[in-house]
Amino acid sequence: MIKPQIWFAGTPEFATAALDALVKHVSVAGVLTQPDRPAGRGRKLKASAVKARAEHYQLPIAQPERLQESAPPFAHLPRPDIVVVVAYGLLLPQWFLDYPRLGCINIHASLLPRWRGAAPIQRAIEAGDEETGISIMQMDAGLDTGAVWLEKRLPIGEQSASQLHDALMQLGAEALIDVLPDILAQARAPIPQPSSGACYAHKLSKAEAEINWQDDAANIVRKIRAFDLFPVAYSYLDDAPVRFYDGIALSEHTESAPAGTVIEHNQEGIDIVCGSGILRIKRLQLAGKNVVSAAALANGCHLKGRHFARKNQL
C-alpha cells in the first residue's frame, strides 16, 4: 500500500493533539503554521505551539503570510492526498482547498451547523448548551459549511472554556484517527449539514467580558466559565479592574442592596448581588496581583460592603 501524503495546517495548542495523533498513527509529510508573532511584554517573536511540536518531530515546516497559487508550500514535495486543518487561522483560498487529491478536512469544536465560526467553545458555554462536540468536516468555500464526515458528542456540564478546550482537543484527535481511513479509502461520502439550526460563534472581544450586575447570576456564571481563557470576565472596584475566574450562582435573595454590592466575604467565597440571584466568586484577580481564591483574599482584603460597577457607572 502506498503511504498517503498528508499535510497538516494548524497554529495554537488546540491543534497539537491532532498532529501528535497523525504522527503516531499515520505520517505527516509537511506542516503549515502561521508565522512567528510578537508576544509577551518584550514583544519578541514566538513560534506557534504547532511549530514547536513539528520541530520536535523534525517535520518540514512552512510559514507563509498568505497562501499563493504562484508559490505553493512544499513545492518540492508530491501533491498531498489530503490536508488536515485545525485552527490554522489563515484564509484558505479555493485553489488550496482543491490542491490535495481528496481536498482539505477540518476539525471543528462544535456540533455543526451550530456554532460555526471563531469561538465555538466559548459561545456554547455562554449560551448554556448542555452538550457540544467535534465535527470532522470536508472544507468548502463557506465558513464551516462543509459536509460532515464524523461527529462526536461531549456533555458540557459545569466545565469552563479551558477545561472544555482540553477535552475537545483530545476528542478531536481521536475522531480524526477514527475517520481518516474511510476518507483516504473513499469508502463513503460525508453528510451535508442540515439546512436549519445554524448559528455563528463570533470572535470574542474584551468589551463583552465586562459584567453587567443587573444580569441574572446564572448568566454571569456562564460568562465567567466561557471567558476564563480569554478575554476573562471582569468588573471594576474603585476604578481598578478585577478579573473573575470561578463562581457559582446562588438562589434568589431578599437583599435590598444595589446590584454589584458585596454582601458577604468569607471562606466560602465573595457573595455579590445581581439583578436576579447572588453570584458567589471563588477565584479572582485584583489589579496588579496574582489569581487567588476568595478564601485566601479574605485573610488580608475583606470586601464585604464594597461595590463592583461597570466602567461607565463609576
From Swiss-Prot:
Belongs to the Fmt family. HAMAP family: Formyl_trans. It catalyses: L-methionyl-tRNA(fMet) + (6R)-10-formyltetrahydrofolate = N-formyl-L-methionyl-tRNA(fMet) + (6S)-5,6,7,8-tetrahydrofolate + H(+). It comes from Dichelobacter nodosus (strain VCS1703A). Pfam families: Formyl_trans_C, Formyl_trans_N. It comes from the Bacteria. (6S)-5,6,7,8-tetrahydrofolate binds at residues 110-113. The lineage of its organism: Bacteria, Pseudomonadati, Pseudomonadota, Gammaproteobacteria, Cardiobacteriales. InterPro entries: Fmt (IPR005794), Formyl_trans_C (IPR005793), Formyl_transf_N (IPR002376), Formyl_transf_N_sf (IPR036477), Formyl_transferase-like_C_sf (IPR011034), Met-tRNA-FMT_C (IPR044135), Met-tRNA-FMT_N (IPR041711). Keywords: Protein biosynthesis, Transferase. It is an enzyme of class 2 (transferase). One of its GO terms (molecular function) is methionyl-tRNA formyltransferase activity. Attaches a formyl group to the free amino group of methionyl-tRNA(fMet). The formyl group appears to play a dual role in the initiator identity of N-formylmethionyl-tRNA by promoting its recognition by IF2 and preventing the misappropriation of this tRNA by the elongation apparatus. GO terms for cellular component: cytosol. The keyword Protein biosynthesis applies. Its EC number is 2.1.2.9. Gene3D superfamilies: 3.40.50.12230. This is Methionyl-tRNA formyltransferase.
